[in-house]
A protein has these predicted regions:
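Thiamine diphosphate
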Residues: 1-12, 77-78, 82-186
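Electropositive phosphate-/nucleotide-binding environments in soluble metabolic enzymes
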Residues: 2-5, 9, 21-32, 45-56, ...
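Short conserved AdoMet
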Residues: 16, 63, 114
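A charged, well-structured terminal subsegment
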Residues: 13-21
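Active-site diphosphate/adenylate-binding microenvironment
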Residues: 29-106, 110
Length: 186
């Protein structure tokens, strides 16, 4: 720990004569090329897309004024790495507490605050199941948002965290889920 002023002075001293030369366009271009590769459409049209490929499809279909919104699960981490914001204030993530269920309500609020912008909510099936009721609010108010639901059989992110920390799988995947995909246009 350090006093802010003292800490900055020590960091400045440690840097010596090194200065920031500005952004490196080559690094950005290299990253975008890698991102484009993993977000490209699946080569096999009969296979299910990865979350990364879903992000790519949404990105390609979005307009410059689009705001993407997400809150919980694995999707914020993927969007953080792969989404290419086209305008300022077009990337809305709730990182702090991974609030499952905030996505649709948050998207509704964004659209109400900026009605001229397109709002795309990216949500996992677990968060969607926790709180999808704000869709009825959006319809009742005539507020158009787009909701993209990704499916990892329930709470796949929680399952991976549980298993990765030495826990046993417990009631967080829908192993026998064979329901049809949701296609709703209000």
């Amino acid at each position: 720990t350090a006093d802010a002023k003292i800490g900055l002075e020590k960091l400045s001293s440690a840097l010596g004569g090194h200065t920031y030369a500005g952004p490196d366009a080559g690094v950005k271009a290299s990253w975008f090329a890698k991102a484009d590769a993993v977000t490209a459409a699946p080569a096999d049209s009969n296979s299910l897309p990865t979350d990364m490929q879903v992000i790519g499809a949404v990105q390609r279909a979005s307009r410059d004024n689009t705001v993407v919104m997400c809150a919980a699960g694995t999707m914020p981490g993927e969007l953080h790495q792969l989404w290419k914001s086209k305008l300022p204030l077009s990337y809305h993530m709730e990182y702090g507490f991974s609030c499952m269920g905030y996505e649709i309500a948050g998207g509704l609020g964004i659209k109400m605050a900026e009605p001229e912008r397109d709002v795309i909510v990216m949500v996992g099936d677990g968060s969607y199941m926790m709180m999808n009721s704000e869709l009825a609010t959006a319809v009742g108010m005539g507020v158009k948002i787009t909701v993209v639901i990704t499916d990892n059989r329930g709470y796949g992110c929680i399952n991976r965290l549980q298993m990765g920390t030495g826990g046993a799988q417990f009631n967080n995947l829908y192993a026998h889920s064979n329901v049809s995909p949701i296609a709703i246009d209000f």
